[in-house]
Amino acid sequence: MALLAPGTPIREGLDRIVNGRTGGLIVLGDGPEINGVCSGGFPLDVRLTPQALRELSKMDGGLVVSSDHERIKAAAVHFVPDGSLPTLETGTRHRTADRLSQQTGVPVVVVSASMSVMSLFLNGRRYLIERPEQLLARANQALATLASYRGRLVDEAENLTTLEIRDQVQVRDVAAVAQRVEMWRRIDAEVRGYVSALGVEGRLVQLQRNELSLGVEDLGRLLTDDYRPNSVAPGGFSLSGLQKLSWEDLLNVTMVAETINLGPAEHPLDSPIRARGHRQLTLMTDLSSRTIQRIIDHFSDLQSLVSASTSELGDIKGVGLRRAREIRQGLESIFEGDQRTHHH
């Protein structure tokens, strides 16, 4: 879809065909498999420009574009795909395009003259190529959802921080954050799809998406680093399995806990669990991941880190006294913030 995004020569040419109301059929690739379904027409080798695409599509028949989408290789071609291939399309052009793409595996674009609609056929599926304003409306809707999911995720992560400092984390709390990470990831993937489909029109969406991913994108990795079991046993704690869950299952915390392998089988939802401290150290310092790993290897979990003295921290290679103070102050401010909210 990125190839047909606004701003690309192919898309500009297609827009001109739509505006000219002539219609067209364009095969986005050339090769032996395409030669086998062509009859008539004439071979060419001209640079693909919006003007050339528009002019050459005025003739009867279709166009063949090179596989790198840089050149037009044939025009006025009559295509004869295998007529026994199943298609639900009704218009002649659309039926031909559907069968062509099924038979060759090459994407085929159709502009319908009567409806001014562009469709992309690929592997037996038809995708509507929407106008930028239609895409933008949907992208903005997805951004609004992403913003609200981000808010919930940040809340869950802050709640987890409080519980980590108090040493009150249960399996269900980690599962709740993992659930939110995956919900955010799904909508983010949708937004990224719109960005690539929007091409040059997608810059603003991209900027907003970048802003909404700040501080959230690494959460999944930090959560994994914090709660992975020590054993190197296969099938340890991992968020990737959540991508396979249906939305319905994703809303079920027990399912989530089982899928990330913190599950009720070996740990009931209310069983206690301790963080190593990766997330907290990453949030409050600019230490390299190597140094953070050294600190964590030294203290084994966040609880021992919380009770460590500045000098004990400073002695670890790569930390030093200034950073050690930063870490102490960071931990204390979380602790004090928690005390304050606790007393209110």
Curated annotation (Swiss-Prot):
EC number: 2.7.7.85
Record flagged with keyword Amino-acid biosynthesis: no
Enzyme class name: transferase
UniProt cross-references to InterPro entries, sorted A to Z: DisA, DisA_sf, DNA_integrity_DisA_N_sf, DNA_integrity_scan_DisA_link, DNA_integrity_scan_DisA_N, DNA_integrity_scanning_protein, RuvA_2-like
One Gene Ontology biological process: DNA repair
Domain DAC: 1-133
Any Pfam family the entry gives: DisA-linker
Catalytic activity entry: 2 ATP = 3',3'-c-di-AMP + 2 diphosphate
Annotated ATP binding sites: 61, 92-96
Gene3D superfamilies: 5' to 3' exonuclease, C-terminal subdomain (1.10.150.20), DNA integrity scanning linker region (1.20.1260.110), DNA integrity scanning protein, DisA, N-terminal domain (3.40.1700.10)
Top-rank lineage group of the source organism: Bacteria
Keywords (A to Z) from UniProt: ATP-binding, DNA damage, DNA repair, DNA-binding, Magnesium, Nucleotide-binding, Nucleotidyltransferase, Transferase
Molecular functions (GO terms): adenylate cyclase activity; ATP binding; diadenylate cyclase activity; DNA binding
Keyword DNA repair in annotation: yes
Cofactor(s) it depends on: Mg(2+)
Protein's job: Participates in a DNA-damage check-point. DisA forms globular foci that rapidly scan along the chromosomes searching for lesions. Also has diadenylate cyclase activity, catalyzing the condensation of 2 ATP molecules into cyclic di-AMP (c-di-AMP). c-di-AMP likely acts as a signaling molecule that may couple DNA integrity with a cellular process.
Quaternary structure annotation from Swiss-Prot or TrEMBL: Homooctamer.
Family: Belongs to the DisA family.
Protein name: DNA integrity scanning protein DisA
Organism: Cutibacterium acnes (strain DSM 16379 / KPA171202) (Propionibacterium acnes)
